[in-house]
């Protein structure tokens, strides 16, 4: 019997009882936490290079936000959301995605017309899915939203941003897939024909697909349970219903991508999982040669009606999101190694030394140096092997033979005298010595 099936009385009688994390959630620590933070830091730096500002919104939102934006017939709203009533009987939801929350925040705080109209985010999302590789009930997304007029250049820039971000990880088999869902009028004309076509195959649909057939047949194309069947593959293509202006913009985008050496393929079946998308949609897909399967690692698109739908003005926007855990899986398979930072150990010979050096150590850390120190065990010979085994390259200590305070390179044994120097002089000398030693080491390779 699992612990969550036990009564309170039974739990009280279980000695050494251990509560486990819920199914589909993760703990990150040590190497996993380093990898997690590395991905967030990489995204943050890339987002700021493209002039995005950070935005944070609540994990908890009103259910209606996602019902109105993501779409009633989507898998996320119809099957996967964590929904509950609060004590005031208001229907709440844990956010399954971030775009709706970001737009709600921008509308509510009157930021839609703000000059700073690019925002990036990261945080936990929640979907009640069957946990498997790359799919979790709590997962972390990084993403961005750009409130910008519909143009082929803004479409291109968002793809360039996504491509540059993923380029930091040197994945071998990542394919950019793009499609155009058209504007509202084009899509409505298409849906009329799509509905007529699907009515011929009503007997092949389950209850959920029949509901989608009436409310939004486009969602049937996104259903992974049936979209491999021939009658789905042979359905009318939305691209055939686009007007010349929409097609021209899409062609311009393709030319920009070619000129920038960003390889891509057009996937006319690509619709994405949310109802708010129109015009450009895209996914960066990783192809696993061993399992011959595809894993979407980043996806997004343009949305022209969501801002107005959530009470704002008629305004265009575009954005994307990526799953951090999926990126972690791929980087771990690539045998990712934590970027090495030069580390220093400051040895304190006694408690007096320890208190005297606290400010010195803090100021070294402020100079972007990784510094460790001993707070007990004041015998250097007892901890020297541990310092070396941790990969620490530089040691600052009082050398009794030389009667000097020195910084020593533990690899080549070079050292520099720091005796009788002011704290600021010591810090500058340490920084210069480390830079010089690292430069000489790199030149000798």
Swiss-Prot record:
One MF annotation (Gene Ontology) recorded for this entry: ATP binding
Which regions form coiled coils?
none
Q: Kindly give the InterPro entries that the UniProt entry links to this protein.
A: aa-tRNA-synth_II, aa-tRNA-synth_II/BPL/LPL, His-tRNA-ligase, HisRS-like_core, HisRS/HisZ
One Pfam family, short name please? tRNA-synt_His
Q: What is its EC number?
A: 6.1.1.21
What Gene Ontology terms describe where this protein resides (cellular component)? cytoplasm
Q: Primary place of residence?
A: cytoplasm
User: Which GO terms fall under biological process for this protein?
Assistant: histidyl-tRNA aminoacylation
Q: Which SUPFAM superfamilies match?
A: Class II aaRS and biotin synthetases
Q: Where in the cell is it found?
A: Cytoplasm
SUBUNIT field: Homodimer.
Report what the protein is called: Histidine--tRNA ligase
What is the species listed in this Swiss-Prot or TrEMBL entry?
Mycoplasma mobile (strain ATCC 43663 / 163K / NCTC 11711)
């Amino acid at each position: 019997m699992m612990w969550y099936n036990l009564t309170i009385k039974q739990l009280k009688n279980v000695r050494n009882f251990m509560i486990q994390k819920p199914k589909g959630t993760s703990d990150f620590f040590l190497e996993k936490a380093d990898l997690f933070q590395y991905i967030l830091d990489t995204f943050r730096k890339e987002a700021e290079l493209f002039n995005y500002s950070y935005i944070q919104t609540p994990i908890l939102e009103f259910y209606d936000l996602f019902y109105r934006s993501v779409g009633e017939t989507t898998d996320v709203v119809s099957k996967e959301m964590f929904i509950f009533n609060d004590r005031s009987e208001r229907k709440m939801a844990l956010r399954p995605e971030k775009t709706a929350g970001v737009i709600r925040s921008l509308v509510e705080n009157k930021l839609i017309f703000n000059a700073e109209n690019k925002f990036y985010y990261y945080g936990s999302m929640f979907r009640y899915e069957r946990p498997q590789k790359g799919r979790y009930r709590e997962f972390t997304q990084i993403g961005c939203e750009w409130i910008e007029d519909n143009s082929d250049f803004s479409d291109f820039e968002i793809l360039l941003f996504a491509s540059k971000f993923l380029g930091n990880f040197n994945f071998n088999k990542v394919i950019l897939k793009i499609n155009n869902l058209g504007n509202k009028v084009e899509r409505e004309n298409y849906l009329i024909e799509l509905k007529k076509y699907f009515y011929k195959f009503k007997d092949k649909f389950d209850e959920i697909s029949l509901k989608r057939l009436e409310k939004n047949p486009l969602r049937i194309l996104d259903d992974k349970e049936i979209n491999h069947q021939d009658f789905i593959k042979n359905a009318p293509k939305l691209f055939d219903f686009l007007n010349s202006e929409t097609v021209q913009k899409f062609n311009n985008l393709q030319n920009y991508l070619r000129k920038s050496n960003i390889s891509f393929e057009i996937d006319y079946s690509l619709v994405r999982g949310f109802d708010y998308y129109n015009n450009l949609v895209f996914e960066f897909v990783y192809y696993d040669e061993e399992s011959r399967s595809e894993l979407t690692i980043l996806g997004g698109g343009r949305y022209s009606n969501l801002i107005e739908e959530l009470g704002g003005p008629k305004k265009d926007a575009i954005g994307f999101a990526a799953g951090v855990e999926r990126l972690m899986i791929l980087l771990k398979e690539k045998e990712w190694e934590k970027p090495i930072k030069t580390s220093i150990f400051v040895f304190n010979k006694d408690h007096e030394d320890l208190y005297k050096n606290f400010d010195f150590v803090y100021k070294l850390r402020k100079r972007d140096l990784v510094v460790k120190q001993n707070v007990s065990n004041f015998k250097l010979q007892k901890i020297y092997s541990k310092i070396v085994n941790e990969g620490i390259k530089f040691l600052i200590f009082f050398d009794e033979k030389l009667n000097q305070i020195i910084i020593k390179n533990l690899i080549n044994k070079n050292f520099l005298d720091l005796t009788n120097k002011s704290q600021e002089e010591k810090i500058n000398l340490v920084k210069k010595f480390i830079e010089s030693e690292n430069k000489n080491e790199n030149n000798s390779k």
